[in-house]
Protein backbone atom coordinates (compact mmCIF):
# COMPACT_ATOMS: atom_id res chain seq x y z
CA UNK A 1 0.00 0.00 0.00
CA UNK A 2 1.99 3.02 -1.24
CA UNK A 3 1.34 6.53 -2.55
CA UNK A 4 -1.93 6.44 -4.48
CA UNK A 5 -4.01 8.73 -6.66
CA UNK A 6 -7.64 9.67 -6.19
CA UNK A 7 -8.75 7.03 -8.69
CA UNK A 8 -6.91 4.22 -6.90
CA UNK A 9 -8.45 4.30 -3.43
CA UNK A 10 -9.32 1.05 -1.72
CA UNK A 11 -11.19 -0.03 1.39
CA UNK A 12 -9.92 1.35 4.67
CA UNK A 13 -10.45 1.00 8.38
CA UNK A 14 -9.43 4.58 9.13
CA UNK A 15 -8.93 7.79 7.16
CA UNK A 16 -6.35 10.15 8.67
CA UNK A 17 -6.48 13.74 7.39
CA UNK A 18 -3.08 15.37 7.79
CA UNK A 19 0.48 14.06 7.81
CA UNK A 20 2.30 16.10 10.45
CA UNK A 21 2.91 15.32 14.11
CA UNK A 22 -0.71 14.32 14.79
CA UNK A 23 -1.45 12.64 11.47
CA UNK A 24 1.91 10.91 11.33
CA UNK A 25 1.61 9.52 14.84
CA UNK A 26 -2.01 8.46 14.37
CA UNK A 27 -1.32 6.66 11.09
CA UNK A 28 1.87 5.07 12.44
CA UNK A 29 0.15 3.60 15.50
CA UNK A 30 -2.81 2.30 13.52
CA UNK A 31 -0.78 0.80 10.65
CA UNK A 32 1.81 -0.82 12.91
CA UNK A 33 -1.03 -2.65 14.66
CA UNK A 34 -2.61 -3.86 11.42
CA UNK A 35 -5.31 -1.33 10.60
CA UNK A 36 -5.74 -0.34 6.95
CA UNK A 37 -5.15 3.40 6.80
CA UNK A 38 -5.56 6.10 4.16
CA UNK A 39 -3.66 9.30 4.91
CA UNK A 40 -4.79 12.38 2.97
CA UNK A 41 -2.47 15.37 2.73
CA UNK A 42 -3.35 18.74 1.18
CA UNK A 43 0.24 19.45 0.12
CA UNK A 44 2.63 17.82 -2.26
CA UNK A 45 4.89 14.84 -1.72
CA UNK A 46 8.18 15.71 -0.03
CA UNK A 47 11.37 13.74 0.60
CA UNK A 48 13.87 15.04 3.20
CA UNK A 49 16.45 12.58 1.88
CA UNK A 50 16.59 14.26 -1.52
CA UNK A 51 15.30 17.79 -0.89
CA UNK A 52 17.23 18.94 2.19
CA UNK A 53 20.09 21.41 1.50
CA UNK A 54 22.21 19.78 4.21
CA UNK A 55 25.59 21.27 3.42
CA UNK A 56 24.67 24.51 1.67
CA UNK A 57 26.13 27.68 3.13
CA UNK A 58 24.18 30.97 3.05
CA UNK A 59 26.20 32.29 0.11
CA UNK A 60 24.77 29.47 -2.06
CA UNK A 61 21.22 30.82 -1.74
CA UNK A 62 19.56 33.81 -3.38
CA UNK A 63 20.06 36.93 -1.25
CA UNK A 64 22.33 34.77 0.91
CA UNK A 65 19.32 32.94 2.26
CA UNK A 66 17.56 35.91 3.83
CA UNK A 67 13.80 35.99 4.41
CA UNK A 68 11.37 36.67 1.57
CA UNK A 69 7.54 36.68 1.44
CA UNK A 70 7.66 33.20 -0.12
CA UNK A 71 10.24 31.94 2.41
CA UNK A 72 9.67 33.82 5.69
CA UNK A 73 12.31 31.76 7.51
CA UNK A 74 14.86 31.99 4.73
CA UNK A 75 15.57 30.30 1.42
CA UNK A 76 16.89 27.08 2.97
CA UNK A 77 13.91 26.54 5.29
CA UNK A 78 12.18 23.22 4.67
CA UNK A 79 8.68 24.68 4.32
CA UNK A 80 7.26 24.33 0.81
CA UNK A 81 4.12 26.13 -0.37
CA UNK A 82 3.61 27.51 3.10
CA UNK A 83 3.85 30.47 5.41
CA UNK A 84 1.48 32.98 6.93
CA UNK A 85 0.06 33.60 3.46
CA UNK A 86 -0.55 30.74 1.01
CA UNK A 87 -1.35 31.79 -2.58
CA UNK A 88 -4.99 31.13 -3.42
CA UNK A 89 -5.82 30.14 0.17
CA UNK A 90 -6.74 33.33 2.07
CA UNK A 91 -8.18 33.73 5.51
CA UNK A 92 -9.94 36.70 7.07
CA UNK A 93 -9.38 38.73 10.23
CA UNK A 94 -12.32 40.63 11.72
CA UNK A 95 -10.01 43.26 13.18
CA UNK A 96 -7.64 45.54 11.29
CA UNK A 97 -5.84 46.30 14.55
CA UNK A 98 -2.59 44.38 14.99
CA UNK A 99 -3.60 43.43 18.54
CA UNK A 100 -6.77 41.77 17.23
CA UNK A 101 -5.25 39.92 14.30
CA UNK A 102 -4.38 36.22 14.10
CA UNK A 103 -1.60 35.11 11.76
CA UNK A 104 -2.16 31.57 10.48
CA UNK A 105 0.91 29.58 9.43
CA UNK A 106 0.35 26.63 7.10
CA UNK A 107 2.69 24.16 5.40
CA UNK A 108 1.25 22.52 2.29
CA UNK A 109 3.59 19.53 2.11
CA UNK A 110 3.86 15.94 3.28
CA UNK A 111 4.90 16.05 6.91
CA UNK A 112 3.46 19.52 7.43
CA UNK A 113 5.20 21.66 10.02
CA UNK A 114 7.31 18.78 11.34
CA UNK A 115 9.75 19.47 8.52
CA UNK A 116 10.31 23.00 9.82
CA UNK A 117 9.68 23.15 13.58
CA UNK A 118 12.16 23.95 16.35
CA UNK A 119 12.09 20.39 17.82
CA UNK A 120 11.54 21.57 21.40
CA UNK A 121 9.83 18.63 23.10
CA UNK A 122 8.51 19.28 26.60
CA UNK A 123 6.04 17.26 28.63
CA UNK A 124 3.06 19.00 30.16
CA UNK A 125 3.17 18.67 33.94
CA UNK A 126 0.44 17.71 36.43
CA UNK A 127 -0.55 21.36 36.96
CA UNK A 128 -0.96 21.82 33.20
CA UNK A 129 -3.71 19.22 32.98
CA UNK A 130 -5.70 20.72 35.88
CA UNK A 131 -5.07 24.48 35.65
CA UNK A 132 -8.59 25.53 36.66
CA UNK A 133 -8.29 23.46 39.81
CA UNK A 134 -5.27 25.58 40.79
CA UNK A 135 -6.38 29.11 39.96
CA UNK A 136 -10.03 28.97 38.85
CA UNK A 137 -9.32 30.06 35.27
CA UNK A 138 -9.92 28.30 31.96
CA UNK A 139 -10.61 24.57 31.77
CA UNK A 140 -9.27 21.34 33.21
CA UNK A 141 -8.45 18.42 30.94
CA UNK A 142 -10.55 15.24 31.16
CA UNK A 143 -7.33 13.32 31.85
CA UNK A 144 -4.30 13.78 34.06
CA UNK A 145 -0.56 13.54 33.63
CA UNK A 146 -0.48 9.95 34.89
CA UNK A 147 -2.74 8.82 32.06
CA UNK A 148 -0.55 10.40 29.37
CA UNK A 149 2.87 9.64 30.90
CA UNK A 150 3.21 6.18 29.27
CA UNK A 151 2.55 7.76 25.88
CA UNK A 152 5.10 10.50 26.50
CA UNK A 153 7.56 7.66 27.16
CA UNK A 154 6.67 5.94 23.91
CA UNK A 155 6.90 9.07 21.79
CA UNK A 156 10.27 10.05 23.27
CA UNK A 157 11.66 6.59 22.62
CA UNK A 158 10.32 6.50 19.06
CA UNK A 159 11.31 9.94 17.81
CA UNK A 160 14.46 10.43 19.91
CA UNK A 161 14.56 13.33 22.39
CA UNK A 162 17.67 14.60 24.13
CA UNK A 163 17.45 16.02 27.64
CA UNK A 164 17.91 15.28 31.33
CA UNK A 165 15.78 14.59 34.39
CA UNK A 166 16.16 17.50 36.81
CA UNK A 167 13.32 16.87 39.26
CA UNK A 168 11.85 20.36 38.90
CA UNK A 169 8.33 21.43 39.84
CA UNK A 170 5.71 20.66 37.18
CA UNK A 171 8.51 19.66 34.79
CA UNK A 172 8.13 15.87 34.74
CA UNK A 173 11.06 13.51 34.56
CA UNK A 174 11.01 10.86 31.85
CA UNK A 175 11.17 7.15 32.61
CA UNK A 176 14.63 5.54 32.52
CA UNK A 177 15.83 4.91 28.98
CA UNK A 178 13.57 7.46 27.31
CA UNK A 179 15.92 10.43 26.91
CA UNK A 180 19.14 10.69 24.93
CA UNK A 181 22.15 12.54 26.40
CA UNK A 182 21.97 16.31 25.92
CA UNK A 183 24.64 17.98 23.77
CA UNK A 184 27.53 19.80 25.38
CA UNK A 185 26.64 23.36 26.47
CA UNK A 186 28.08 26.24 24.52
CA UNK A 187 30.17 28.89 26.27
CA UNK A 188 27.23 31.29 26.18
CA UNK A 189 24.98 28.61 27.70
CA UNK A 190 27.26 28.22 30.70
CA UNK A 191 27.42 31.97 31.21
CA UNK A 192 23.64 32.30 31.05
CA UNK A 193 23.28 29.39 33.46
CA UNK A 194 25.68 30.91 35.98
CA UNK A 195 24.21 34.41 35.95
CA UNK A 196 20.57 33.32 35.76
CA UNK A 197 21.00 31.08 38.80
CA UNK A 198 22.23 34.10 40.74
CA UNK A 199 18.80 35.55 40.03
CA UNK A 200 17.05 32.38 41.18
CA UNK A 201 16.29 31.16 37.66
CA UNK A 202 17.12 27.49 36.98
CA UNK A 203 18.84 26.73 33.67
CA UNK A 204 18.97 23.07 32.66
CA UNK A 205 19.47 20.87 29.62
CA UNK A 206 16.91 21.46 26.89
CA UNK A 207 14.65 18.77 25.49
CA UNK A 208 14.68 18.60 21.70
CA UNK A 209 13.84 15.90 19.16
CA UNK A 210 17.38 15.47 17.84
CA UNK A 211 19.46 12.28 18.01
CA UNK A 212 22.66 12.86 19.96
CA UNK A 213 23.37 9.16 19.56
CA UNK A 214 21.86 6.30 17.62
CA UNK A 215 18.63 4.84 18.95
CA UNK A 216 18.82 1.46 20.68
CA UNK A 217 17.26 -0.69 17.96
CA UNK A 218 17.49 -3.81 20.12
CA UNK A 219 15.63 -2.69 23.25
CA UNK A 220 13.29 0.09 22.16
CA UNK A 221 11.14 -1.82 19.62
CA UNK A 222 10.05 -4.28 22.33
CA UNK A 223 8.99 -1.40 24.57
CA UNK A 224 7.16 0.37 21.77
CA UNK A 225 5.27 -2.63 20.39
CA UNK A 226 5.13 -5.43 23.00
CA UNK A 227 3.89 -8.70 21.58
CA UNK A 228 4.02 -7.47 17.98
CA UNK A 229 7.04 -9.13 16.36
CA UNK A 230 6.32 -7.70 12.92
CA UNK A 231 6.16 -4.11 14.17
CA UNK A 232 9.29 -4.67 16.25
CA UNK A 233 11.24 -5.88 13.23
CA UNK A 234 10.08 -2.97 11.07
CA UNK A 235 10.91 -0.27 13.60
CA UNK A 236 14.24 -1.90 14.51
CA UNK A 237 15.32 -1.75 10.88
CA UNK A 238 14.11 1.82 10.58
CA UNK A 239 15.99 2.92 13.70
CA UNK A 240 19.22 1.55 12.25
CA UNK A 241 18.76 3.81 9.23
CA UNK A 242 18.57 6.96 11.35
CA UNK A 243 21.98 8.50 12.03
CA UNK A 244 22.99 10.55 15.05
CA UNK A 245 23.25 14.29 14.44
CA UNK A 246 26.67 15.50 13.34
CA UNK A 247 25.76 19.20 13.57
CA UNK A 248 25.73 19.73 9.81
CA UNK A 249 22.89 22.15 9.31
CA UNK A 250 20.04 24.01 11.05
CA UNK A 251 17.17 21.66 11.86
CA UNK A 252 14.67 23.94 10.13
CA UNK A 253 16.04 22.83 6.78
CA UNK A 254 14.98 19.24 7.44
CA UNK A 255 17.41 16.36 7.78
CA UNK A 256 18.46 13.90 5.09
CA UNK A 257 19.95 11.43 7.60
CA UNK A 258 16.92 11.31 9.90
CA UNK A 259 18.75 12.76 12.90
CA UNK A 260 15.84 14.96 13.93
CA UNK A 261 12.14 14.27 14.12
CA UNK A 262 10.05 14.80 11.01
CA UNK A 263 7.02 12.64 10.35
CA UNK A 264 8.44 12.13 6.86
CA UNK A 265 11.52 10.37 8.28
CA UNK A 266 10.20 8.88 11.54
CA UNK A 267 6.51 7.99 11.25
CA UNK A 268 5.77 7.46 7.59
CA UNK A 269 8.57 5.11 6.40
CA UNK A 270 7.86 2.35 8.96
CA UNK A 271 4.11 2.80 8.59
CA UNK A 272 4.45 2.39 4.82
CA UNK A 273 6.64 -0.67 5.37
CA UNK A 274 3.72 -2.46 7.04
CA UNK A 275 1.84 -2.49 3.74
CA UNK A 276 -1.16 -1.09 5.61
CA UNK A 277 -0.81 2.61 4.76
CA UNK A 278 -1.83 4.43 1.59
CA UNK A 279 -0.96 8.10 1.18
CA UNK A 280 -2.88 10.49 -1.07
CA UNK A 281 -1.15 13.85 -1.51
CA UNK A 282 -2.38 17.11 -3.07
CA UNK A 283 -5.93 16.42 -1.92
CA UNK A 284 -7.77 19.16 -0.01
CA UNK A 285 -10.31 17.66 2.39
CA UNK A 286 -13.25 19.98 3.00
CA UNK A 287 -16.01 17.82 4.44
CA UNK A 288 -16.74 14.77 6.57
CA UNK A 289 -19.95 13.10 5.40
CA UNK A 290 -22.27 10.83 7.37
CA UNK A 291 -24.46 7.81 6.75
CA UNK A 292 -28.15 7.63 7.60
CA UNK A 293 -27.39 6.62 11.19
CA UNK A 294 -25.29 9.74 11.74
CA UNK A 295 -21.93 7.97 11.65
CA UNK A 296 -18.98 9.23 9.64
CA UNK A 297 -18.74 7.43 6.29
CA UNK A 298 -15.72 9.24 4.90
CA UNK A 299 -14.45 12.55 3.58
CA UNK A 300 -14.85 14.65 0.46
CA UNK A 301 -11.85 16.38 -1.09
CA UNK A 302 -10.64 18.37 -4.05
CA UNK A 303 -7.90 16.71 -6.08
CA UNK A 304 -5.57 19.69 -6.49
CA UNK A 305 -3.80 18.04 -9.42
CA UNK A 306 -6.93 17.72 -11.57
CA UNK A 307 -9.33 20.11 -9.85
CA UNK A 308 -11.94 17.37 -9.56
CA UNK A 309 -13.92 16.34 -6.49
CA UNK A 310 -13.41 12.99 -4.81
CA UNK A 311 -14.53 10.83 -1.90
CA UNK A 312 -12.82 8.35 0.39
CA UNK A 313 -14.63 5.98 2.76
CA UNK A 314 -13.64 4.19 5.96
CA UNK A 315 -14.98 2.77 9.22
CA UNK A 316 -13.60 5.75 11.15
CA UNK A 317 -12.27 9.23 10.37
CA UNK A 318 -9.43 10.99 12.21
CA UNK A 319 -8.93 14.70 11.65
CA UNK A 320 -5.30 15.70 12.24
CA UNK A 321 -4.96 18.57 9.80
CA UNK A 322 -3.73 21.11 12.44
CA UNK A 323 -6.05 22.84 14.87
CA UNK A 324 -7.54 25.53 12.63
CA UNK A 325 -7.74 23.38 9.49
CA UNK A 326 -9.51 20.63 11.42
CA UNK A 327 -12.01 23.17 12.76
CA UNK A 328 -12.51 24.50 9.25
CA UNK A 329 -13.34 21.02 7.94
CA UNK A 330 -15.85 20.43 10.73
CA UNK A 331 -17.51 23.83 10.29
CA UNK A 332 -17.78 23.24 6.54
CA UNK A 333 -19.31 19.77 7.13
CA UNK A 334 -22.73 21.29 7.70
CA UNK A 335 -26.12 20.11 6.53
CA UNK A 336 -29.78 20.89 7.03
CA UNK A 337 -29.69 18.84 10.24
CA UNK A 338 -26.37 20.38 11.32
CA UNK A 339 -26.40 24.01 10.10
CA UNK A 340 -23.61 24.99 12.51
CA UNK A 341 -21.22 22.29 11.36
CA UNK A 342 -20.39 18.75 12.41
CA UNK A 343 -19.70 17.83 16.05
CA UNK A 344 -21.01 21.22 17.18
CA UNK A 345 -24.07 20.47 19.29
CA UNK A 346 -22.30 22.23 22.16
CA UNK A 347 -21.79 25.40 20.11
CA UNK A 348 -18.12 25.33 21.12
CA UNK A 349 -16.61 24.42 17.75
CA UNK A 350 -14.13 27.11 16.73
CA UNK A 351 -13.99 28.60 20.21
CA UNK A 352 -11.13 28.92 22.71
CA UNK A 353 -8.42 29.25 20.09
CA UNK A 354 -5.03 29.73 21.75
CA UNK A 355 -1.42 30.40 20.80
CA UNK A 356 1.76 30.67 22.86
CA UNK A 357 2.66 34.00 24.45
CA UNK A 358 5.96 35.19 23.00
CA UNK A 359 8.41 38.05 23.16
CA UNK A 360 12.16 38.42 22.60
CA UNK A 361 15.17 40.40 23.77
CA UNK A 362 18.71 40.31 22.40
CA UNK A 363 21.80 41.17 24.37
CA UNK A 364 25.45 41.77 23.50
CA UNK A 365 27.88 40.33 26.03
CA UNK A 366 31.42 41.81 26.18
CA UNK A 367 32.66 38.70 28.03
CA UNK A 368 31.97 36.74 24.83
CA UNK A 369 33.92 39.08 22.53
CA UNK A 370 37.16 38.09 20.80
CA UNK A 371 36.96 34.43 21.76
CA UNK A 372 39.40 32.09 19.99
CA UNK A 373 37.84 30.57 16.85
CA UNK A 374 36.01 27.36 17.72
CA UNK A 375 33.03 25.40 16.42
CA UNK A 376 29.78 25.69 18.36
CA UNK A 377 27.34 24.56 15.67
CA UNK A 378 25.74 21.91 17.85
CA UNK A 379 22.10 20.94 17.48
CA UNK A 380 21.24 24.26 15.80
CA UNK A 381 18.69 25.22 18.46
CA UNK A 382 19.20 25.77 22.16
CA UNK A 383 21.15 23.23 24.18
CA UNK A 384 19.73 24.57 27.46
CA UNK A 385 16.61 26.40 28.64
CA UNK A 386 14.98 27.78 31.78
CA UNK A 387 11.67 26.16 32.84
CA UNK A 388 9.14 28.26 34.74
CA UNK A 389 10.31 28.80 38.30
CA UNK A 390 7.76 31.04 40.07
CA UNK A 391 4.83 28.68 40.70
CA UNK A 392 4.61 29.59 44.39
CA UNK A 393 4.69 33.35 43.89
CA UNK A 394 2.17 33.05 41.09
CA UNK A 395 -0.26 30.98 43.16
CA UNK A 396 -0.06 33.62 45.91
CA UNK A 397 -1.04 36.31 43.39
CA UNK A 398 2.22 38.23 43.51
CA UNK A 399 2.92 38.46 39.78
CA UNK A 400 -0.17 39.99 38.21
CA UNK A 401 -0.62 37.12 35.76
CA UNK A 402 -1.86 33.60 36.36
CA UNK A 403 0.27 31.32 34.19
CA UNK A 404 3.97 30.94 33.52
CA UNK A 405 6.54 30.77 30.74
CA UNK A 406 9.85 29.15 29.96
CA UNK A 407 12.92 30.77 28.46
CA UNK A 408 14.60 29.56 25.30
CA UNK A 409 17.94 31.17 24.56
CA UNK A 410 20.77 30.78 22.11
CA UNK A 411 24.15 32.31 21.47
CA UNK A 412 27.48 31.03 20.29
CA UNK A 413 29.59 30.87 17.19
CA UNK A 414 27.19 29.02 14.91
CA UNK A 415 27.26 29.36 11.13
CA UNK A 416 26.80 33.06 10.30
CA UNK A 417 24.08 34.26 7.96
CA UNK A 418 22.98 37.57 6.48
CA UNK A 419 21.21 38.29 9.77
CA UNK A 420 24.47 37.86 11.67
CA UNK A 421 26.18 40.70 9.80
CA UNK A 422 23.19 43.03 9.68
CA UNK A 423 22.67 42.42 13.37
CA UNK A 424 25.99 44.07 14.17
CA UNK A 425 25.11 47.51 12.81
CA UNK A 426 24.12 48.94 16.20
CA UNK A 427 27.63 48.09 17.45
CA UNK A 428 29.86 48.90 14.48
CA UNK A 429 28.81 52.57 14.06
CA UNK A 430 28.92 52.39 10.29
CA UNK A 431 32.43 50.96 10.06
CA UNK A 432 33.56 49.84 6.61
CA UNK A 433 36.24 47.73 4.97
CA UNK A 434 39.03 46.47 7.21
CA UNK A 435 37.51 48.10 10.30
CA UNK A 436 34.19 46.37 9.70
CA UNK A 437 35.95 43.00 9.36
CA UNK A 438 37.71 43.63 12.65
CA UNK A 439 34.39 44.56 14.28
CA UNK A 440 32.71 41.45 12.86
CA UNK A 441 35.43 39.21 14.31
CA UNK A 442 35.17 41.01 17.64
CA UNK A 443 31.41 40.85 18.06
CA UNK A 444 30.62 37.57 16.28
CA UNK A 445 29.44 35.06 18.86
CA UNK A 446 28.85 37.68 21.56
CA UNK A 447 25.08 37.95 21.00
CA UNK A 448 22.57 36.00 23.08
CA UNK A 449 18.89 35.88 22.11
CA UNK A 450 16.21 35.26 24.73
CA UNK A 451 12.73 34.08 23.73
CA UNK A 452 9.84 33.66 26.13
CA UNK A 453 7.21 31.00 25.53
CA UNK A 454 4.23 31.31 27.84
CA UNK A 455 0.77 29.99 28.53
CA UNK A 456 -2.33 31.68 27.15
CA UNK A 457 -5.57 31.23 29.05
CA UNK A 458 -8.52 30.42 26.73
CA UNK A 459 -11.07 33.19 26.33
CA UNK A 460 -14.40 33.69 24.58
CA UNK A 461 -13.02 36.37 22.25
CA UNK A 462 -10.37 34.23 20.51
CA UNK A 463 -12.12 32.01 18.01
CA UNK A 464 -12.62 31.21 14.34
CA UNK A 465 -15.66 30.74 12.14
CA UNK A 466 -16.49 30.34 8.46
CA UNK A 467 -16.49 33.60 6.52
CA UNK A 468 -19.84 33.93 4.72
CA UNK A 469 -18.37 35.42 1.54
CA UNK A 470 -14.74 34.44 0.95
CA UNK A 471 -13.67 31.14 -0.60
CA UNK A 472 -10.28 29.77 -1.55
CA UNK A 473 -9.13 28.84 -5.05
CA UNK A 474 -10.78 25.43 -4.66
CA UNK A 475 -14.16 26.95 -3.81
CA UNK A 476 -13.93 26.04 -0.12
CA UNK A 477 -15.18 28.64 2.40
CA UNK A 478 -12.32 30.07 4.46
CA UNK A 479 -11.85 30.85 8.14
CA UNK A 480 -12.47 34.21 9.74
CA UNK A 481 -10.57 34.92 12.96
CA UNK A 482 -11.35 36.87 16.10
CA UNK A 483 -8.44 37.40 18.50
CA UNK A 484 -7.80 39.00 21.85
CA UNK A 485 -5.07 38.73 24.47
CA UNK A 486 -6.06 39.19 28.10
CA UNK A 487 -4.07 41.09 30.72
CA UNK A 488 -2.72 37.76 31.96
CA UNK A 489 -0.84 37.38 28.68
CA UNK A 490 0.26 41.00 28.24
CA UNK A 491 1.50 41.22 31.84
CA UNK A 492 3.34 37.97 31.28
CA UNK A 493 5.06 39.40 28.19
CA UNK A 494 6.13 42.46 30.18
CA UNK A 495 7.58 40.18 32.87
CA UNK A 496 9.52 38.32 30.17
CA UNK A 497 11.06 41.55 28.90
CA UNK A 498 12.08 42.62 32.39
CA UNK A 499 13.52 39.19 33.20
CA UNK A 500 15.55 38.92 30.01
CA UNK A 501 17.01 42.37 30.56
CA UNK A 502 17.96 41.40 34.12
CA UNK A 503 19.79 38.30 32.91
CA UNK A 504 21.66 40.30 30.27
CA UNK A 505 22.63 42.86 32.91
CA UNK A 506 23.83 40.08 35.21
CA UNK A 507 26.01 38.84 32.34
CA UNK A 508 27.59 42.27 32.07
CA UNK A 509 25.89 42.87 28.75
CA UNK A 510 23.75 45.48 27.08
CA UNK A 511 20.29 45.14 25.57
CA UNK A 512 19.80 45.79 21.89
CA UNK A 513 17.02 48.34 21.55
CA UNK A 514 14.54 49.06 24.31
CA UNK A 515 13.15 46.94 27.08
CA UNK A 516 9.42 47.15 26.41
CA UNK A 517 7.54 47.73 29.65
CA UNK A 518 4.12 47.74 27.95
CA UNK A 519 3.22 44.08 27.53
CA UNK A 520 0.59 44.89 24.92
CA UNK A 521 3.40 46.23 22.71
CA UNK A 522 5.88 43.52 23.65
CA UNK A 523 3.69 40.50 22.97
CA UNK A 524 4.05 38.78 19.59
CA UNK A 525 0.92 38.75 17.38
CA UNK A 526 -1.50 35.86 17.79
CA UNK A 527 -0.45 32.90 15.66
CA UNK A 528 3.09 34.11 15.12
CA UNK A 529 4.63 31.55 17.49
CA UNK A 530 2.89 28.83 15.40
CA UNK A 531 1.63 26.95 18.46
CA UNK A 532 -2.10 27.43 17.89
CA UNK A 533 -4.31 24.88 19.62
CA UNK A 534 -7.94 24.65 20.68
CA UNK A 535 -11.09 25.15 18.65
CA UNK A 536 -12.48 21.65 19.27
CA UNK A 537 -11.65 21.23 22.93
CA UNK A 538 -11.96 17.98 24.85
CA UNK A 539 -13.84 17.68 28.12
CA UNK A 540 -16.06 15.56 30.36
CA UNK A 541 -19.32 17.30 29.42
CA UNK A 542 -20.86 17.18 25.90
CA UNK A 543 -22.54 20.52 26.63
CA UNK A 544 -19.24 22.39 27.01
CA UNK A 545 -16.78 20.50 24.78
CA UNK A 546 -16.49 18.97 21.32
CA UNK A 547 -14.74 15.67 22.12
CA UNK A 548 -14.07 13.38 25.04
CA UNK A 549 -10.61 12.67 26.43
CA UNK A 550 -9.77 10.38 23.51
CA UNK A 551 -10.56 13.04 20.92
CA UNK A 552 -13.77 11.19 20.04
CA UNK A 553 -16.52 13.56 18.94
CA UNK A 554 -19.48 13.52 21.30
CA UNK A 555 -21.90 13.78 18.36
CA UNK A 556 -20.32 11.25 15.96
CA UNK A 557 -18.89 8.12 17.63
CA UNK A 558 -16.51 7.14 14.81
CA UNK A 559 -15.10 10.63 14.27
CA UNK A 560 -11.90 11.55 16.09
CA UNK A 561 -9.77 14.69 16.39
CA UNK A 562 -6.14 13.82 17.09
CA UNK A 563 -4.38 17.17 16.65
CA UNK A 564 -4.02 20.22 18.87
CA UNK A 565 -7.61 21.34 18.30
CA UNK A 566 -8.66 19.29 21.34
CA UNK A 567 -6.40 21.16 23.81
CA UNK A 568 -8.54 22.86 26.50
CA UNK A 569 -5.47 24.77 27.70
CA UNK A 570 -2.11 25.66 26.19
CA UNK A 571 0.68 25.26 28.73
CA UNK A 572 3.99 27.07 28.34
CA UNK A 573 5.46 23.79 27.10
CA UNK A 574 5.62 23.67 23.30
CA UNK A 575 2.67 21.49 22.22
CA UNK A 576 4.14 19.04 19.69
CA UNK A 577 5.18 16.27 22.10
CA UNK A 578 1.79 16.39 23.79
CA UNK A 579 0.03 16.30 20.41
CA UNK A 580 1.87 13.09 19.53
CA UNK A 581 1.26 11.49 22.94
CA UNK A 582 -2.46 12.23 22.69
CA UNK A 583 -2.56 10.94 19.10
CA UNK A 584 -0.94 7.64 20.13
CA UNK A 585 -3.43 7.29 23.00
CA UNK A 586 -6.37 8.05 20.70
CA UNK A 587 -5.14 5.56 18.10
CA UNK A 588 -4.84 2.86 20.77
CA UNK A 589 -8.42 3.63 21.77
CA UNK A 590 -9.58 3.33 18.15
CA UNK A 591 -7.82 -0.02 17.80
CA UNK A 592 -9.43 -1.32 20.98
CA UNK A 593 -12.88 -0.15 19.84
CA UNK A 594 -12.33 -1.91 16.52
CA UNK A 595 -11.31 -5.13 18.26
CA UNK A 596 -14.57 -4.96 20.19
CA UNK A 597 -16.42 -4.26 16.91
CA UNK A 598 -17.68 -0.94 18.24
CA UNK A 599 -16.38 0.97 15.21
Regions found by a protein language model. Give the residues of each.
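A short, basic/flexible loop-to-alpha-helix module at the beginning of a structural domain
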Residues: 1-11
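N-terminal Rossmann-like FAD-binding beta1-loop-alpha1 element of flavoenzymes
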Residues: 14-39
Amino acid sequence: MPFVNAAGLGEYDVIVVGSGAAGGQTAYTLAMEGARVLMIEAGRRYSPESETPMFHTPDQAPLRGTSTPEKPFGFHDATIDGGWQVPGEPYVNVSDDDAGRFEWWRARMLGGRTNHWGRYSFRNGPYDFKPKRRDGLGFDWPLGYEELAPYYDKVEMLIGVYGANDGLENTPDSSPGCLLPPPKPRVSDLLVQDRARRLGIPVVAGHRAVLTQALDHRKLPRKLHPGNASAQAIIAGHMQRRAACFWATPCGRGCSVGANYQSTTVHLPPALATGKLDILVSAMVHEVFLDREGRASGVRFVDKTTGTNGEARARAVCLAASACETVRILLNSKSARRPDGLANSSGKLGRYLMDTVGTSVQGQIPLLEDLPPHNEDGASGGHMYAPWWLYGEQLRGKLGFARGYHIEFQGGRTMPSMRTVSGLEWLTSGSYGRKFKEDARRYYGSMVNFDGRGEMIPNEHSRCEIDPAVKDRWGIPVLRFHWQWSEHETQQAAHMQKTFAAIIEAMGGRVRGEVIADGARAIAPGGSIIHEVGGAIMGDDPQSSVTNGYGQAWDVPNLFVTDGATFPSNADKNPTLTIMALAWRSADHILERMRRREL
